Amino acid sequence: MKKNNYILCFTLALLFSWAVPSVAAPLECTLEKNALPEQIKAYTQCLDAKLNRVQQEQDSWIQKRTFELSALESETGNTQILSLFKLSINAKDNYIQRSCQWRYMLKQPNAQQAVVTYKECEIAMTEQFIQQLKTAL
């Protein structure tokens, strides 16, 4: 029984040590000025991966703030706190979508450049929102 626990702990520690650097390492995407279509495709895929990481970080911060605000709501009895926070999250999602859409439309009819612009916009705005979520209550 003890041996199984040691094996389990070792396996979990190994998995955790393998997973942490990949999550913690920032993903940098670069695109040359006169890039070929294959390079643009690779850049777009890199932006997709970066956007996924940024959205995961955002989701973690939203969950953390939701938990904190729920506790604060139960302490104070103010039932508007959490609902206002959730409304602000929805408003932020709409703002990012619309703001990046008009930037996308500016780059049309060049579809590749438009997609890159949209993804870069979404990443930048999500990172800005994460910084706001990190601000202490």
Predicted regions and their residues:
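Bacterial N-terminal signal peptides that target proteins for export
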Residues: 1-10
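N-terminal alpha-helical modules
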Residues: 23-137
